[in-house]
């Protein structure tokens, strides 16, 4: 056995009472959720948890739909307010007068989705894992019939297994932070498709700016995700907190009044990516298999706010496939795992195409494209059944419901 194979098939950790059925590599939100779901099926789980690489402030907040909320509530891991903020309405502004409004009341409900503080959610999941006797948290990989890789888009295990990761880089980086606003957000998520001047470029470049409500009902705090051209990043990151808030206020037309930064700024490149395959045999054996889930399998533009929803849908589908397996079929069976791969690849590809198409549509310069997309927004906002169908899809509801 060579070194790579030895790494892939790490020996059983004697600290565990009995050999695990499944090893999960990655103890983020997706990995811990999967571990808790599998433990309820009376499966023995080894959860590989390694210290995070960064120690800076965590400004992440995720938009979660109804399906994800019900999943986490069922695990008793749904955070309390103000760590969870219901979104009652979403407003999307085009670059030349177009506007879309999505309202929860139009769907006969009180929330479109929820904004959730990542550190609080991670803490709830970690606490639940500690109280689950079927889960053993381990510092290094453990050999098991099935290994599920939930290490994120930079997964080292995926690379070691030789699984391709097809990446299309956008000419955009995301700048994220949190702000205190003069006016309350009112439970409204706001997004602008706009343009920003880039150093060294004669033409302005497409940008997407989102202000997402935080701090519970009636809160004055928002999460910012500002997708800008990479050449504009040094300028925006180099501004003082006051000057950054001022430039941001101009870009969003002072929608929430005066704003002040309440956290450090973070930045990362945006990309569309997907793994060439989601399942396979571990090296050197046909008795152990792997499956990818979450960002280890895919990445998409954040403009639709579906990243974590898609990752949680991965783990829910994998658990469903395991629940429905024939009693004689082992967890590493390729036909079993192919059911999971087929189900998730199609949905993820569809969502990726939608977000990629929207990003590219609003990145096209010129008055013809500008008029086309803004008239399209106007028409879609009045489309009735089509708009309702799209809204229910984003909410994680059955379109026929």
Please tell me what each predicted stretch does:
Residues 12, 17-18, 70, 74, ...:
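Conserved N-terminal helical subregion
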Residues 12, 19-23, 27-88:
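Glycine-rich FAD cofactor-binding loop and adjacent beta-loop-alpha segment at the N-terminus
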Residues 22, 45, 145-147, 291:
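Hydrophobic "anchor" residues on beta-strands that sit immediately upstream
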Residues 25, 48, 150, 294-295, ...:
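Active-site flanking residues adjacent to catalytic metal/cofactor-binding acidic residues
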Residues 72, 145-267, 274:
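Conserved FAD-binding catalytic core of PHBH/FMO-like flavoproteins
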Residues 232-332:
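FAD/FMN-dependent oxidoreductases across multiple families
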Residues 320-401:
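C-terminal helical "tail/cap" subdomain of flavin- and related membrane-associated enzymes
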């Amino acid at each position: 056995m060579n070194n790579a194979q030895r790494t892939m098939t790490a020996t059983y950790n004697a600290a565990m009472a009995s050999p695990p059925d499944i090893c999960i590599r990655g103890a983020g939100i997706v990995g811990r959720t999967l571990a808790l779901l599998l433990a309820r099926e009376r499966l023995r789980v080894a959860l590989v948890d390694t210290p995070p690489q960064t120690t800076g402030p965590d400004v992440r907040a995720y938009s979660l739909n109804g399906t994800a909320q019900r999943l986490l509530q069922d695990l008793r891991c749904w955070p309390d307010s103000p760590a969870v903020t219901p979104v009652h309405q979403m407003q999307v502004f085009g670059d030349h007068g177009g506007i879309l409004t999505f309202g929860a009341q139009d769907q006969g409900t009180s929330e479109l989705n929820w904004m959730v503080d990542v550190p609080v959610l991670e803490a709830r999941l970690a606490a639940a894992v500690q109280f689950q006797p079927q889960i053993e948290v381990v510092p290094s990989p453990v050999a098991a019939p099935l290994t599920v890789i939930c290490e994120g888009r930079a997964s080292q295990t995926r690379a070691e297994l030789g699984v391709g990761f097809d990446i299309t880089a956008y000419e955009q980086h995301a700048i994220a932070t949190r702000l205190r606003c003069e006016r309350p957000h009112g439970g409204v998520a706001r997004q602008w498709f706009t343009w920003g001047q880039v150093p060294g470029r004669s033409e302005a470049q497409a940008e997407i700016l989102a202000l997402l409500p935080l701090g519970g009902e009636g809160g004055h705090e928002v999460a910012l995700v500002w997708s800008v051209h990479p050449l504009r990043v040094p300028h925006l990151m180099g501004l003082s907190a006051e000057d950054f808030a001022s430039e941001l206020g101009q870009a969003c037309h002072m929608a929430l009044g005066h704003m002040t930064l309440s956290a450090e700024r973070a930045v990362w490149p945006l990309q569309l990516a997907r793994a060439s395959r989601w399942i396979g045999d571990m090296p050197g054996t046909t008795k152990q298999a792997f499956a990818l889930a979450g960002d280890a399998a895919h990445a998409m533009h954040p403009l639709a706010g579906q990243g974590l929803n898609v990752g949680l849908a991965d783990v829910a589908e994998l658990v469903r496939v395991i629940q429905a397996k024939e009693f004689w079929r082992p967890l590493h069976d390729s036909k079993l795992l192919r059911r999971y791969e087929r189900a998730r690849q199609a949905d993820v590809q569809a969502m990726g195409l939608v977000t990629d198409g929207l990003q590219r549509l609003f990145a096209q310069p010129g008055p013809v494209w500008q008029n086309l997309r803004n008239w399209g927004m106007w028409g879609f906002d009045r489309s009735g059944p089509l708009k309702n169908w799209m809204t229910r899809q984003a909410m994680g509801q059955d379109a026929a419901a």
